[in-house]
Swiss-Prot record:
UniProt GO MF annotations: RNA binding; small GTPase binding; U6 snRNA binding
Name by which UniProt lists this protein: U6 snRNA-associated Sm-like protein LSm2
Record localization: Nucleus
Major place of residence: nucleus
Any one of the GO BP annotations: spliceosomal tri-snRNP complex assembly
Annotated gene: LSM2
Modified positions (Phosphothreonine) in chain numbering: T79
Entry's family note: Belongs to the snRNP Sm proteins family.
Domain spans labelled Sm: 2-76
Source organism of this protein record: Homo sapiens
Gene3D superfamilies linked: 2.30.30.100
Record-linked Pfam families: LSM
Cited function: Plays a role in pre-mRNA splicing as component of the U4/U6-U5 tri-snRNP complex that is involved in spliceosome assembly, and as component of the precatalytic spliceosome (spliceosome B complex). The heptameric LSM2-8 complex binds specifically to the 3'-terminal U-tract of U6 snRNA.
């Protein structure tokens, strides 16, 4: 649940989601659920010539299992806090 909580804290921020089919979608994070499914608003694709059918899409739902990467705004992410939380959760799972 660590990453779910982390992504919930980024709702309203601009992110780039790269899918396993190499499609990259930029947009505002609207919501995320426990399966890390993502809803984006005000989207645009990074390569509109390759994906012209996506030009008319403004909002989308992305299934968590098709996500390769999520690029986050650097100023919104406290990496030290995230590392500490990941270590704490890993220790709790071992016990």
């Amino acid at each position: 649940m660590l990453f779910y909580s982390f992504f919930k804290s980024l709702v309203g921020k601009d992110v780039v989601v790269e899918l396993k089919n190499d499609l990259s979608i930029c947009g505002t994070l609207h919501s995320v659920d426990q399966y890390l499914n993502i809803k984006l608003t005000d989207i645009s694709v990074t390569d509109p010539e390759k994906y012209p059918h996506m030009l008319s899409v403004k909002n989308c739902f992305i299934r968590g299992s098709v996500v390769r990467y999520v690029q986050l705004p650097a100023d919104e992410v406290d990496t030290q806090l995230l590392q500490d939380a990941a270590r704490k959760e890993a220790l709790q799972q071992k016990q």
